[in-house]
Protein backbone atom coordinates (compact mmCIF):
# COMPACT_ATOMS: atom_id res chain seq x y z
CA UNK A 1 0.00 0.00 0.00
CA UNK A 2 1.43 3.41 -0.95
CA UNK A 3 1.20 6.46 1.31
CA UNK A 4 -1.63 8.10 -0.64
CA UNK A 5 -3.77 4.98 -0.39
CA UNK A 6 -2.94 4.63 3.30
CA UNK A 7 -4.13 8.22 3.83
CA UNK A 8 -7.41 7.47 2.07
CA UNK A 9 -6.68 9.62 -0.98
CA UNK A 10 -7.95 8.43 -4.38
CA UNK A 11 -4.58 9.23 -5.96
CA UNK A 12 -1.15 10.72 -5.26
CA UNK A 13 -2.01 14.29 -6.32
CA UNK A 14 -2.55 15.79 -2.85
CA UNK A 15 0.68 14.38 -1.51
CA UNK A 16 2.54 15.43 -4.62
CA UNK A 17 1.29 18.98 -4.07
CA UNK A 18 2.35 19.01 -0.41
CA UNK A 19 5.75 17.47 -1.09
CA UNK A 20 6.65 19.04 -4.40
CA UNK A 21 4.78 22.29 -4.92
CA UNK A 22 4.13 23.87 -1.52
CA UNK A 23 6.68 26.25 -0.01
CA UNK A 24 8.24 24.82 3.14
CA UNK A 25 11.77 24.08 4.30
CA UNK A 26 12.72 20.41 4.55
CA UNK A 27 16.07 21.28 6.15
CA UNK A 28 14.30 23.14 8.94
CA UNK A 29 12.24 19.99 9.58
CA UNK A 30 15.43 17.92 9.51
CA UNK A 31 16.86 20.10 12.26
CA UNK A 32 13.66 19.81 14.29
CA UNK A 33 13.89 16.01 14.02
CA UNK A 34 17.54 16.08 15.10
CA UNK A 35 16.77 18.23 18.14
CA UNK A 36 13.83 15.99 19.07
CA UNK A 37 16.01 12.88 18.87
CA UNK A 38 18.68 14.46 21.06
CA UNK A 39 16.08 15.61 23.57
CA UNK A 40 14.94 12.01 24.07
CA UNK A 41 17.92 9.78 23.25
CA UNK A 42 21.02 11.86 24.03
CA UNK A 43 24.05 10.24 25.61
CA UNK A 44 27.66 11.39 25.64
CA UNK A 45 28.84 7.94 24.52
CA UNK A 46 26.51 7.75 21.52
CA UNK A 47 27.63 6.55 18.09
CA UNK A 48 26.84 8.44 14.89
CA UNK A 49 26.34 5.82 12.18
CA UNK A 50 26.63 6.76 8.50
CA UNK A 51 25.10 4.54 5.83
CA UNK A 52 23.06 4.62 2.65
CA UNK A 53 19.94 2.94 1.35
CA UNK A 54 18.36 2.54 -2.06
CA UNK A 55 14.95 3.68 -3.30
CA UNK A 56 13.96 1.45 -6.21
CA UNK A 57 12.41 3.35 -9.11
CA UNK A 58 11.03 2.88 -12.60
CA UNK A 59 11.77 5.42 -15.31
CA UNK A 60 14.31 8.23 -15.43
CA UNK A 61 12.40 11.29 -14.22
CA UNK A 62 12.80 11.06 -10.42
CA UNK A 63 15.60 13.20 -9.04
CA UNK A 64 18.91 11.33 -8.82
CA UNK A 65 17.61 8.08 -10.28
CA UNK A 66 20.22 6.03 -12.14
CA UNK A 67 21.44 2.50 -12.62
CA UNK A 68 23.65 2.09 -9.58
CA UNK A 69 24.43 -0.46 -6.92
CA UNK A 70 22.25 -0.61 -3.84
CA UNK A 71 22.40 -3.04 -0.98
CA UNK A 72 18.61 -2.81 -0.79
CA UNK A 73 18.45 -4.95 -3.95
CA UNK A 74 21.91 -6.48 -3.71
CA UNK A 75 22.69 -5.50 -7.29
CA UNK A 76 22.97 -2.67 -9.81
CA UNK A 77 19.47 -1.48 -10.56
CA UNK A 78 17.42 1.64 -11.31
CA UNK A 79 17.22 3.55 -8.03
CA UNK A 80 17.89 6.64 -5.98
CA UNK A 81 20.49 6.53 -3.19
CA UNK A 82 19.99 8.38 0.07
CA UNK A 83 22.84 8.90 2.54
CA UNK A 84 21.77 8.98 6.20
CA UNK A 85 23.15 9.64 9.67
CA UNK A 86 21.59 7.75 12.58
CA UNK A 87 22.05 8.58 16.24
CA UNK A 88 22.57 5.41 18.29
CA UNK A 89 22.73 5.41 22.07
CA UNK A 90 21.81 3.09 24.92
CA UNK A 91 18.40 4.82 24.90
CA UNK A 92 17.51 3.96 21.30
CA UNK A 93 18.29 5.00 17.74
CA UNK A 94 16.82 7.29 15.10
CA UNK A 95 17.84 9.23 11.99
CA UNK A 96 19.08 12.80 12.43
CA UNK A 97 20.23 13.68 8.90
CA UNK A 98 19.79 12.69 5.25
CA UNK A 99 20.61 13.79 1.74
CA UNK A 100 19.97 12.53 -1.77
CA UNK A 101 23.06 11.46 -3.70
CA UNK A 102 23.27 12.86 -7.23
CA UNK A 103 25.37 10.82 -9.70
CA UNK A 104 27.59 12.73 -12.13
CA UNK A 105 25.24 11.94 -15.00
CA UNK A 106 22.79 14.21 -13.18
CA UNK A 107 25.12 16.99 -12.06
CA UNK A 108 26.61 17.18 -15.59
CA UNK A 109 23.15 17.83 -17.08
CA UNK A 110 21.82 21.30 -16.09
CA UNK A 111 18.51 20.80 -17.90
CA UNK A 112 17.83 17.63 -15.98
CA UNK A 113 18.64 19.34 -12.68
CA UNK A 114 16.34 22.25 -13.49
CA UNK A 115 13.47 19.92 -14.36
CA UNK A 116 13.40 18.53 -10.80
CA UNK A 117 14.19 21.85 -9.08
CA UNK A 118 17.65 20.99 -7.75
CA UNK A 119 19.01 24.18 -6.09
CA UNK A 120 21.65 26.00 -8.11
CA UNK A 121 24.29 25.60 -5.38
CA UNK A 122 24.01 21.80 -5.34
CA UNK A 123 26.76 20.12 -7.35
CA UNK A 124 28.40 16.73 -7.46
CA UNK A 125 29.60 15.36 -4.13
CA UNK A 126 30.86 11.89 -3.34
CA UNK A 127 29.09 9.88 -0.67
CA UNK A 128 32.01 10.37 1.78
CA UNK A 129 31.79 14.12 1.14
CA UNK A 130 28.08 14.06 1.93
CA UNK A 131 28.94 12.20 5.13
CA UNK A 132 31.48 14.85 6.19
CA UNK A 133 28.80 17.51 5.78
CA UNK A 134 26.41 15.56 8.00
CA UNK A 135 29.10 15.09 10.64
CA UNK A 136 29.90 18.80 10.49
CA UNK A 137 26.23 19.71 10.97
CA UNK A 138 26.02 17.42 14.00
CA UNK A 139 29.13 18.98 15.54
CA UNK A 140 27.93 22.55 14.91
CA UNK A 141 24.59 21.64 16.51
CA UNK A 142 26.43 20.31 19.60
CA UNK A 143 25.02 16.81 19.16
CA UNK A 144 26.58 14.68 21.93
CA UNK A 145 28.42 11.69 20.49
CA UNK A 146 31.79 10.03 21.02
CA UNK A 147 32.11 7.77 17.98
CA UNK A 148 31.38 7.51 14.27
CA UNK A 149 30.90 4.17 12.52
CA UNK A 150 30.50 3.41 8.83
CA UNK A 151 31.15 0.78 6.19
CA UNK A 152 33.79 0.71 3.44
CA UNK A 153 32.07 3.44 1.42
CA UNK A 154 32.80 5.93 4.20
CA UNK A 155 36.24 4.77 5.37
CA UNK A 156 38.01 6.90 2.76
CA UNK A 157 38.40 10.59 1.99
CA UNK A 158 38.47 13.37 4.54
CA UNK A 159 36.34 11.74 7.23
CA UNK A 160 39.28 10.47 9.29
CA UNK A 161 40.99 13.86 9.53
CA UNK A 162 37.69 15.59 10.22
CA UNK A 163 36.95 13.28 13.15
CA UNK A 164 40.46 13.52 14.56
CA UNK A 165 40.29 17.30 14.57
CA UNK A 166 36.90 17.12 16.26
CA UNK A 167 38.18 14.75 18.95
CA UNK A 168 35.85 11.92 17.93
CA UNK A 169 36.73 8.24 17.80
CA UNK A 170 35.82 6.12 14.82
CA UNK A 171 35.50 2.57 13.49
CA UNK A 172 35.30 2.83 9.69
CA UNK A 173 35.29 0.00 7.18
CA UNK A 174 38.09 -0.28 4.62
CA UNK A 175 38.68 -2.74 1.80
CA UNK A 176 41.14 -5.63 1.88
CA UNK A 177 43.74 -3.75 -0.20
CA UNK A 178 43.99 -0.84 2.25
CA UNK A 179 47.59 -0.51 3.45
CA UNK A 180 48.42 -0.23 7.15
CA UNK A 181 51.79 0.46 8.78
CA UNK A 182 52.74 0.72 12.42
CA UNK A 183 55.39 2.88 13.99
CA UNK A 184 56.78 3.10 17.49
CA UNK A 185 55.41 -0.32 18.39
CA UNK A 186 57.32 -3.39 19.58
CA UNK A 187 55.77 -5.61 16.88
CA UNK A 188 55.99 -3.95 13.44
CA UNK A 189 52.94 -4.28 11.20
CA UNK A 190 53.04 -3.48 7.50
CA UNK A 191 51.03 -4.55 4.47
CA UNK A 192 47.53 -4.72 3.12
CA UNK A 193 44.71 -5.45 5.52
CA UNK A 194 44.21 -8.87 3.92
CA UNK A 195 47.90 -9.81 4.22
CA UNK A 196 48.02 -8.69 7.83
CA UNK A 197 44.92 -10.75 8.67
CA UNK A 198 46.32 -13.90 7.07
CA UNK A 199 49.50 -13.75 9.15
CA UNK A 200 47.81 -13.45 12.53
CA UNK A 201 48.36 -16.24 15.03
CA UNK A 202 45.46 -18.12 16.58
CA UNK A 203 46.21 -16.45 19.91
CA UNK A 204 45.64 -13.02 18.33
CA UNK A 205 41.91 -13.65 17.89
CA UNK A 206 39.14 -13.18 20.41
CA UNK A 207 35.55 -14.35 20.00
CA UNK A 208 33.18 -11.50 20.85
CA UNK A 209 29.59 -10.48 20.22
CA UNK A 210 28.93 -7.31 18.24
CA UNK A 211 25.49 -7.11 19.85
CA UNK A 212 22.21 -8.98 19.94
CA UNK A 213 20.73 -10.12 16.65
CA UNK A 214 17.43 -11.73 15.73
CA UNK A 215 18.97 -15.16 16.35
CA UNK A 216 21.04 -14.34 19.41
CA UNK A 217 24.47 -12.77 19.91
CA UNK A 218 26.25 -11.75 16.68
CA UNK A 219 29.46 -13.63 17.36
CA UNK A 220 32.63 -13.25 15.30
CA UNK A 221 36.34 -13.66 15.85
CA UNK A 222 38.14 -10.33 16.24
CA UNK A 223 41.73 -9.13 16.18
CA UNK A 224 42.85 -5.62 17.14
CA UNK A 225 46.28 -4.22 16.26
CA UNK A 226 47.48 -0.94 17.74
CA UNK A 227 49.52 0.79 15.03
CA UNK A 228 50.63 4.06 16.61
CA UNK A 229 50.09 6.27 19.64
CA UNK A 230 49.79 9.97 18.90
CA UNK A 231 49.23 13.04 21.01
CA UNK A 232 45.85 14.54 20.17
CA UNK A 233 47.51 17.88 19.47
CA UNK A 234 49.24 16.34 16.43
CA UNK A 235 45.84 16.17 14.74
CA UNK A 236 44.89 19.69 15.82
CA UNK A 237 42.32 18.03 18.02
CA UNK A 238 40.23 19.84 20.58
CA UNK A 239 41.06 16.98 22.96
CA UNK A 240 44.22 16.31 24.92
CA UNK A 241 46.06 13.11 25.69
CA UNK A 242 47.25 10.06 23.84
CA UNK A 243 45.17 8.53 21.04
CA UNK A 244 45.74 5.29 19.16
CA UNK A 245 45.41 4.52 15.47
CA UNK A 246 44.63 0.87 14.86
CA UNK A 247 43.34 -1.91 12.64
CA UNK A 248 40.33 -3.97 13.72
CA UNK A 249 39.74 -7.25 11.87
CA UNK A 250 36.54 -9.27 11.95
CA UNK A 251 36.54 -12.92 10.92
CA UNK A 252 33.29 -14.74 10.23
CA UNK A 253 33.10 -18.00 12.16
CA UNK A 254 31.27 -19.96 9.46
CA UNK A 255 33.65 -19.42 6.54
CA UNK A 256 36.57 -17.29 7.74
CA UNK A 257 35.58 -14.28 5.64
CA UNK A 258 37.31 -11.07 6.76
CA UNK A 259 36.14 -7.49 7.23
CA UNK A 260 38.52 -4.65 8.08
CA UNK A 261 38.18 -1.37 9.99
CA UNK A 262 40.47 1.57 10.55
CA UNK A 263 40.14 2.88 14.10
CA UNK A 264 40.97 5.98 16.13
CA UNK A 265 40.39 5.97 19.87
CA UNK A 266 41.80 7.13 23.21
CA UNK A 267 44.85 5.09 24.21
CA UNK A 268 43.86 2.11 26.33
CA UNK A 269 40.51 1.57 24.61
CA UNK A 270 39.65 -2.12 24.76
CA UNK A 271 38.86 -4.35 21.80
CA UNK A 272 35.47 -4.96 23.41
CA UNK A 273 34.66 -1.26 23.13
CA UNK A 274 35.68 -1.09 19.47
CA UNK A 275 33.65 -4.19 18.65
CA UNK A 276 30.64 -2.65 20.40
CA UNK A 277 31.02 0.55 18.35
CA UNK A 278 31.22 -1.42 15.11
CA UNK A 279 28.19 -3.43 16.19
CA UNK A 280 26.15 -0.24 16.46
CA UNK A 281 26.06 -0.13 12.65
CA UNK A 282 23.36 -2.79 12.84
CA UNK A 283 21.00 -0.17 14.29
CA UNK A 284 20.86 1.85 11.07
CA UNK A 285 20.03 -1.27 9.06
CA UNK A 286 17.19 -1.94 11.48
CA UNK A 287 16.12 1.69 11.12
CA UNK A 288 15.99 1.47 7.33
CA UNK A 289 13.90 -1.69 7.45
CA UNK A 290 11.46 -0.30 10.01
CA UNK A 291 11.18 3.11 8.33
CA UNK A 292 10.39 1.50 4.98
CA UNK A 293 7.98 -1.10 6.31
CA UNK A 294 6.16 1.04 8.87
CA UNK A 295 6.57 4.69 7.82
CA UNK A 296 6.74 4.60 4.03
CA UNK A 297 10.31 5.89 3.79
CA UNK A 298 10.63 4.53 0.25
CA UNK A 299 7.08 5.39 -0.90
CA UNK A 300 7.76 8.91 -2.12
CA UNK A 301 5.00 10.24 -4.41
CA UNK A 302 7.00 13.11 -5.92
CA UNK A 303 9.93 13.38 -8.35
CA UNK A 304 11.62 16.62 -7.32
CA UNK A 305 14.67 17.33 -5.14
CA UNK A 306 12.50 19.12 -2.58
CA UNK A 307 9.87 16.40 -2.69
CA UNK A 308 12.38 13.68 -1.83
CA UNK A 309 13.85 15.61 1.11
CA UNK A 310 10.43 16.60 2.44
CA UNK A 311 9.04 13.08 2.25
CA UNK A 312 12.11 11.54 3.85
CA UNK A 313 12.20 14.16 6.62
CA UNK A 314 8.57 13.44 7.48
CA UNK A 315 9.32 9.71 7.65
CA UNK A 316 12.30 10.50 9.89
CA UNK A 317 10.01 12.49 12.19
CA UNK A 318 7.58 9.58 12.50
CA UNK A 319 10.45 7.20 13.23
CA UNK A 320 11.90 9.56 15.85
CA UNK A 321 8.56 9.78 17.64
CA UNK A 322 8.35 5.99 17.71
CA UNK A 323 11.90 5.79 19.11
CA UNK A 324 11.05 8.27 21.87
CA UNK A 325 7.86 6.39 22.79
CA UNK A 326 9.75 3.10 22.82
CA UNK A 327 12.39 4.59 25.13
CA UNK A 328 9.79 5.91 27.57
CA UNK A 329 7.94 2.60 27.55
CA UNK A 330 11.10 0.53 28.05
CA UNK A 331 13.54 2.51 30.19
CA UNK A 332 16.93 0.84 30.70
CA UNK A 333 17.51 -0.72 34.12
CA UNK A 334 19.52 1.44 36.52
CA UNK A 335 23.24 0.80 36.46
CA UNK A 336 25.83 1.39 39.11
CA UNK A 337 28.36 2.48 36.51
CA UNK A 338 28.10 4.91 33.61
CA UNK A 339 25.01 4.69 31.44
CA UNK A 340 26.49 3.18 28.28
CA UNK A 341 29.28 0.79 29.30
CA UNK A 342 29.36 -0.89 25.87
CA UNK A 343 30.91 2.21 24.33
CA UNK A 344 33.13 3.29 27.21
CA UNK A 345 36.88 3.50 27.21
CA UNK A 346 38.75 1.24 29.58
CA UNK A 347 41.38 3.32 31.33
CA UNK A 348 44.83 1.77 31.45
CA UNK A 349 48.18 3.11 32.66
CA UNK A 350 50.07 5.04 30.02
CA UNK A 351 52.83 3.00 28.51
CA UNK A 352 54.97 5.90 27.29
List each model region and its residues.
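Basic, amphipathic alpha-helical segments enriched in Lys/Arg and hydrophobic/aromatic residues
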Residues: 297-352
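Structural motif
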Residues: 72-78, 253, 303-312
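Short coil/turn segments at secondary-structure boundaries
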Residues: 1-5, 288-294
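Conserved, well-structured functional cores that handle cations and Mg-NTP chemistry
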Residues: 1-172, 176-179, 186-187, 196, ...
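Short amphipathic alpha-helical segments and their helix-coil junctions
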Residues: 58-69, 290-302
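An anionic, glycine-rich sequence signature occurring as long contiguous blocks
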Residues: 74, 91-116, 120, 169-283
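Feature representing long, continuous alpha-helical segments
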Residues: 282-289, 315, 319
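Short, solvent-exposed helix-loop connector elements
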Residues: 263, 269-278, 292-310, 329
Amino acid sequence: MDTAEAAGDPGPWRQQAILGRRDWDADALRDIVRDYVIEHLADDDAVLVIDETGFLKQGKASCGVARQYTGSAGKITNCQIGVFAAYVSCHGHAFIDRTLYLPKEWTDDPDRLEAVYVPADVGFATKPKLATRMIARAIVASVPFKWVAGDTVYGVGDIEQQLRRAGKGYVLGVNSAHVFRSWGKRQPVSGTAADIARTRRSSDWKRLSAGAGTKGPRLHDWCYLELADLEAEQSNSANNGLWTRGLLIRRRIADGDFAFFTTWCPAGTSIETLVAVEGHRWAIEDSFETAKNEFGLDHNESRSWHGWHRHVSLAMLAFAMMAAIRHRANPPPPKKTNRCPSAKTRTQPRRH
